[in-house]
Amino acid sequence: MAKMIPSLVSLILIGLVAIASAAVIFEERFDDGWENRWVKSEWKKDDNTAGEWKHTAGNWSGDANDKGIQTSEDYRFYAISAEFPEFSNKDKTLVFQFSVKHEQKLDCGGGYMKLLSGDVDQKKFGGDTPYSIMFGPDICGYSTKKVHAILTYNEANHLIKKDVPCETDQLTHVYTFILRPDATYSILIDNVEKQTGSLYSDWDLLPPKKIKDPSAKKPEDWDEQEYISDPEDKKPDGYDDIPKEIPDTDSKKPEDWDDEEDGEWTAPTIPNPEYMGEWKPKQIKNPNYKGKWEAPLIDNPDFKDDPELYVFPKLKYVGLELWQVKSGSLFDNVLICDDPDYAKKLADETWGKLKDAEKAAFDEAEKKNEEEESKDAPAESDAEDEPEDDEGGDDSDSESKAEETKSVDSEETSEKDATAHDEL
């Protein structure tokens, strides 16, 4: 037992050293002084559509002192960024993580963040500013509820080809993107892996390694017909003599039928139960079937591997650039590092520690809202006691027309919102 104790101590020390050696490139918890580290962009200020950020813990939280930054104005563009020492992830794991809470029942707006490279004029940072990585949730209507993972390669933005659903409730969630030197990646939500794979297969960063041989031709004797008619199956004798319809033997000539005036009476016809339709031989498996022919794959002459496909050599800024129809998205605990374990630890210490208390605060807020709404709603007895007269009817018609107008305006606004979102 005594011999085991030093070994156990050694393992603990090794673990502590590993954590201590984790390189934290950028970590922001939005405590006091955060405004000195972040630059608010002047993008969209000239046309008065730039939104203001609010430093707050939100309307419900697990800790009122644990604040982030929140969008505060509807129908606004938001842009803010922070600089960190230039960093390359060559031969290192890149971890990009942050938390976001959509308090506003978000129906159209982004919740993603960006990593930028090179030199950027932060005062002009906006939708047209080139970025290296864009990652995080995006919601717009019923069709878009996903996690973006967009990588820039050779000055082109490439979207992930896999679908990664995002969270859509009004609570805080942690989004993590991990990019490794072996060109593999993982996407986590609340410390749970939701997607993983390779840069080679899940983005179209490079031409495919293999392509179909354009010179290949299908052999003339290649049989793609899976089923054939049974040559042993023969049509029964007299099959074609079976009529499709037969006289209805149960029908009787009407008593008032006059052959001289009405003509000779004939019984109506009914479908013949013995009629089987056009005869066709039964189908059997084709013994010569070879399957659907496909051209063989060959090496793509246009493919050139890039061993540094995963590398972003001059990462220098992290930013938020959003369009929001309804404001209320709150961002916090932004992390850029090279150690997934440290990122998990940070998420556990922040989101994990407070999520139950936040859920309780949210439930309490919802309960209060329901109580307030029930107080404002007219009692049924009061509604029944109200006199019904012509003037009341006119008012009702006016209110109905007003509501119809609001509905039309709302539909038109939703269409405009979706259009603005798609243009981002």
Curated annotation (Swiss-Prot):
Residues carrying a glycan: 59
Region (Disordered): 210-279, 362-424
Signal peptide (UniProt feature, chain positions): 1-22
Repeat found in the keyword field: yes
GO cellular component, one term: endoplasmic reticulum
Subcellular location(s) of the protein: Endoplasmic reticulum lumen
Biased composition (Acidic residues): 221-230, 379-397
Motif placement: Prevents secretion from ER: 421-424
Subcellular location, principal: endoplasmic reticulum
Record region (4 X approximate repeats): 194-259
Repeat (Sequence) residue spans along the chain: 194-205, 213-224, 230-241, 248-259, 263-273, 277-287, 291-301
GO MF, any single term: calcium ion binding
Disulfide-bond pairs as recorded: 108-140
Region listing for 3 X approximate repeats, in residue ranges: 263-301
Any matching Pfam family: Calreticulin
Phosphoserine carried by residues: 381, 396
Coiled coil: none
Keywords: Calcium, Chaperone, Disulfide bond, Endoplasmic reticulum, Glycoprotein, Lectin, Metal-binding, Phosphoprotein, Repeat, Signal, Zinc
Binding residues for an alpha-D-glucoside: 112, 114, 131, 138, 321
Functional summary from the UniProt entry: Molecular calcium-binding chaperone promoting folding, oligomeric assembly and quality control in the ER via the calreticulin/calnexin cycle. This lectin may interact transiently with almost all of the monoglucosylated glycoproteins that are synthesized in the ER.
Domain remark from Swiss-Prot or TrEMBL: Can be divided into a N-terminal globular domain, a proline-rich P-domain forming an elongated arm-like structure and a C-terminal acidic domain. The P-domain binds one molecule of calcium with high affinity, whereas the acidic C-domain binds multiple calcium ions with low affinity.
Protein family per UniProt: Belongs to the calreticulin family.
Protein name: Calreticulin-2
